[in-house]
């Protein structure tokens, strides 16, 4: 299976439209959204074309393929307008080989700084902790937890490392895809 992984949209209609175009091109089996979908948050600047009401139908059109977890900027009111479950702090997927992918935003389970996993749950060797929250791309083995892959797709709309991005998981491997701005 092919998973497209995105995080931290923060209500940007422009970047959500770009993401939908990428989804149409990539043709993933499932879309993983790691939280912070509609609200920009009190510490972030407004993203380009901040329009949560325009983001809602774009995401709802993909609801049957979305697996989502709650970010620190997501609330019950967001769940009222989105057609897919959003309020879980984590979800677990297993790929074709049985590898566990632990999906979380990162504010509750373990992604404080760049690759900190101090609050990560115990995961079997060979698992992956897939998280957002920091707006910084990561794809590396954990130094603190041997056998644990850390993957952060970066931010769709407010990157803190210079490039808008999402991730792909396919064939047991993670990769980043940079989104270009018009």
What does each of the following model-derived ranges do?
Residues 107-182:
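Conserved beta-sheet core of the metallophosphoesterase superfamily
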Residues 42-50, 82-123, 160-161:
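Active-site-proximal segments of metal-dependent phosphoesterases and phosphodiesterases across multiple
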Residues 12, 28, 34-35, 78, ...:
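Aromatic-residue detector
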Residues 5-7, 31-36, 66-72, 102-105, ...:
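Active-site neighborhood of phospho(di)ester-bond hydrolases with catalytic His/Asp-centered motifs
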Residues 1-3, 92-102, 143-150, 171-175:
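Beta-strand-turn-beta hairpins that frame and shape the catalytic cleft
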Residues 2-95:
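Core catalytic region of metal-dependent phosphoesterases/phosphodiesterases
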Residues 61-63, 88, 96-98, 124, ...:
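Short, well-ordered coil/turn elements that cap or connect secondary structure elements
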